[in-house]
Amino acid sequence: QITHAADAWLSQPELKAIEKPDVVVSRSDPITLGFDGSRGRSKKKPDATALVGCRVSDGHLFNIHVWEAPEGPSAKDWRIPEAEVESAVRDSFQNYNVVGFYADPAMWDGHVAQWEAAYGRSLKVAYTRDKPMAFNTRSISRVVAGFEALRAAIVDGEISYDGSFPLTRHFLNARRQSVRSGIVLRKPNDNYLAKIDATYAAMLAFSARLDALGKGVGTARSGVPRRIY
């Protein structure tokens, strides 16, 4: 059973209140993407890599894919399946109306540069003109603002999420850490193998969504939602 600690970023009741597993995101709905990648290893187990979507019209967050090492001895030799990540990004642009994509380029800068070259011109929202996707996570103030806005939207019930196990687990794993600019997120002190990468990906997708709204992108719903086969 998942529980939450005193320094948890979110509680189970707060997440449960916005859970909407039956929401269907259509091909025509403008969405934003957030990507947090990893190649590092923590105590012989690699961090996760996550790709999360956010519908611009209502802020609905949904898991596209989270790649994590399996439990047990096989985790020792596990590596992030780069081909699967590339395929998931490509499929997202084919299957959804992607208007913005913010990605943490750390250790994935070559991939992010390739995605910018392939899809950058199609985006309505850009982090910068030269690097439309590469979100500068070294800008602590921007990260703090991103998590503050996301948490407020969740706690106030302004958005929803798909209730997927990876997103739920990563959200509840996140712990608050005070810095000069505000609050950033970290792993639990007593469980450094716990993953929070999807929480960062969700923040990036939500930040892109806010920037899209600021530009008037995706504010009108179009079409009837339909499943993607």
Spans of features found by a protein language model:
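ATPase catalytic-site recognition across NTP-hydrolyzing enzymes
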Residues: 1-35
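Nucleic-acid-processing active sites and adjacent nucleic-acid-binding tracks
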Residues: 23-24, 42-45, 52-103
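Long hydrophobic segments that form regular secondary structure
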Residues: 27-42, 55, 192-195, 202
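Beta-sheet entry/capping signal
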Residues: 29-32, 48-50, 59-63, 98-101, ...
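A short acidic (Asp/Glu
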Residues: 43-49, 108-118, 147
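Metal-dependent DNA phosphodiester-chemistry modules and their immediately adjacent helices/loops
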Residues: 63-64, 114-216
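Acidic, metal-coordinating catalytic cores used for nucleic-acid/nucleotide bond scission
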Residues: 102-112, 139-140
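Acidic, low-complexity intrinsically disordered tails
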Residues: 215-229
